[in-house]
């Protein structure tokens, strides 16, 4: 169908799987995991009309560094769902990766003898994502990340599952049963495994400010301008400037939404 100017935009697609580690699938279906395949990516990109803006890769898996080298000029590469060590992560960034998906989740942490992929990202100017639903990451780690990476490199994300906005209950995610209770979604058969988020991006931004003490201006930038730049759509989205779409949320001091303006037209 022809897209009208009043329609909400699908700006891009994150191909979070299947080029990930079978040991760090999180809530993804392990049956779908495979090595990175440039031909498969290009076939999907053609079907998507060029909308795939980000491809997630576990660089330690056989052949995946070669995929990064081959495809990084066609799409942005993000390190994700990985068991990679520091040295392999450095090789991935040197090969062309520029991004890290949901930092801290589904990856090795930081220790003084094994700094891991997080420190590699910090040293190589990568953008990093944070799920600020107050379930995935402790507020102190959120503040730490803003202080170390800066709001020009932090991208707030919701990582929301299809259950987002729906009542508590049982749902399906990638062919697996999930249980939703409040802001938390988990695999039904493995209740300690978080299955995405049940919170929208605006509420994640709101929680970062009101519950995690992130400065408002930093949280707003990390939810708009920085992610737009990270996937290359900042000529149209992410900030208010001449030539960009006039997409605005008006809120009160408690960040309750009062109006939504989409492409210059008030829709809420």
Show where each model-derived region lies.
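His/Asp/Glu-enriched, well-ordered alpha-helical/loop segment
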Residues: 117-129, 146-158, 164-251
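Metal-cofactor-binding active-site regions of metalloenzymes
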Residues: 8-28
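Short, Lys/Arg- and Gly-enriched loop/turn segments at beta-strand edges
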Residues: 254-261
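Conserved phosphate-binding/catalytic loop of the ribokinase/pfkB sugar-kinase fold
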Residues: 21-49
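Active-site core of metal-dependent hydrolases
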Residues: 42-168
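Short, small-residue-biased leader/transition segments that mark boundaries at the very start
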Residues: 1-5
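Electropositive phosphate-/nucleotide-binding environments in soluble metabolic enzymes
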Residues: 34-38, 61-65, 86, 111-115, ...
